[in-house]
Amino acid sequence: MNAANRIALPEQPRILVIALRRLGDVLMATPLIHSLRQAWPKATIDALVFADTAGILEGNPDLNGIVAMPPRPTAGQGLALAARLWRQYDLAISTQCGDRPTFFALVAGRSSLAPVESTFSGRLKRALLDRSVAYAGGVHRVEEMLQLADALGIARAPRLVCPHPRAVEGVSGDYAVIHAAPMFRYKQWSKEGWRALAAWLAGRGLAVIATGGPGEAERRYLDAVCNGLSVVRRLDGRLDWPQLAGLLAKARVYVGPDTSVTHVAAAAGCPTVALYGPTDPRLWGPWPTGGLDTMWDAAGTMQRRGNVWLVQNPLPCLPCQLEGCERRLESYSACLDELSPRQVIAAVEEALG
């Protein structure tokens, strides 16, 4: 933090944080929002997000409001929102380099901040913005958010903030949570692996709860995983984000792939076993409750940071940062398909203590 560089704002400023990407990106913007709340306790802080990601901010104590926009707005909807936001905030911050979030930061804020790339369009944005951060890539997404706090001259508060937890009726005792069905095929572990893990967890005397999204493909995959497995209680498609946070906070252990639920589990303090394939954990690894003093390595059989165990099948191509071996969302990923149940169970056993 460079206090001499602190931006001058009113004592009770209005601040807008813009995060127009997927659920995980929105969650990873919460350390920036938390830093803003610590710096300006009396501020009004809102977030501009896509409507289908707003739930992950529900009950966030650092936010006063959420401005939700359609994931694919028409030109008319975009212009109407811009007119509605025009100069409504003392400070507007884009968490992305893209044209649309930067445009809304310029429109909404009397002062504006955004990351910019070293391109012609980036140089143009830098000239229009009041403050900017050079986007270089190659660092953890949370670190990118904290660099925006640095640019404002305020102290970092590197904590992911979960949705406000709410209890799930009828769930008690010792239980494990598995999240077998990510939204995209290329992040899936094998059905056989999940079945072996569920049976092992039940053998340890734990109730096994399966979570998942409402999508048809996710439901079908979980159908195949759970077929004939009476030990698994399914709550897929039935929980909102606060309920998920409440469920995860009291779980003995959570196991899941690179998905937003895994990031919530880590932030909630649950012993979390994350199964990573193509995704680079140096950029997108789970953020433990105590933060990351030592960043994740690119690849390894098992790494531990705080309450998170990160498991990989370290093939020579890992991490490729591609959408599976076929470079498409519905592709298989050999690194995950060939990840052995024995390796995952060893990490879960350690996480259970």
PLM features: residue spans?
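Catalytic machinery of carbohydrate-active enzymes
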Residues: 1-353
